[in-house]
């Protein structure tokens, strides 16, 4: 079985390398077969790497550039092409890594990911997904902040992405599609939500 390789933006998040490297060390203990590629400022990370001597299944790639939480996504995309975030996403693009993790600037993460990785045919926008516990197991909720204004088509696409994610990642054979609304009655919500409800009913019946 092929080893999973995950790229990590060491500089992302409010606490920077300290929290990120601690998190990678915890993950490597739980998943010893996963390899990590860390992208960030080596000098600023050395002290935290030394504090986690059990972290051995990783490579570190140095860069002086990082994206701050208040950087505009467009500027991060155009000007910070050697940032730890950009290099990690490039690693997925080149298929050297299977996934990428960053606790950094969400807007920049979405913008760079869409520019570098693109979206698959039939999907117009990326979405942020979260996995929430339920009485019966788990549910995938999206979008959780990547998009402000959505069309009916966008919402349907998000549902389809959630369906595929549930099947592949969570192992749910027949996910149930739902629509988060202001009420359970089909007459509730604006015109976009109502149309989405009708479209999801058609998809669910197929």
Language model features with spans:
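Short helix-capping segments at alpha-helix termini
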Residues: 28-33, 49-58, 170, 200-205
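N-terminal phosphate-binding or glycine-rich loops at protein starts, especially the Walker A/P-loop
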Residues: 1-45
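Phosphate/nucleotide-donor binding subsite
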Residues: 53-97
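Glycine-rich phosphate/diphosphate-binding loop of Rossmann-like nucleotide-binding domains
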Residues: 18, 35-37, 43, 148-206
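Short glycine/serine/threonine-rich phosphate/pyrophosphate-binding segments
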Residues: 16-21, 82-95, 99-113, 120, ...
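Short, acidic/small-residue loops that bind anionic groups at enzyme active sites
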Residues: 110-145, 202-206
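Short glycine-rich anion-binding loops that position phosphate/pyrophosphate groups of nucleotides
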Residues: 11-12, 65-66, 105-107, 115, ...
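Short beta-strand segments
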Residues: 9, 38-39, 61, 102-104, ...
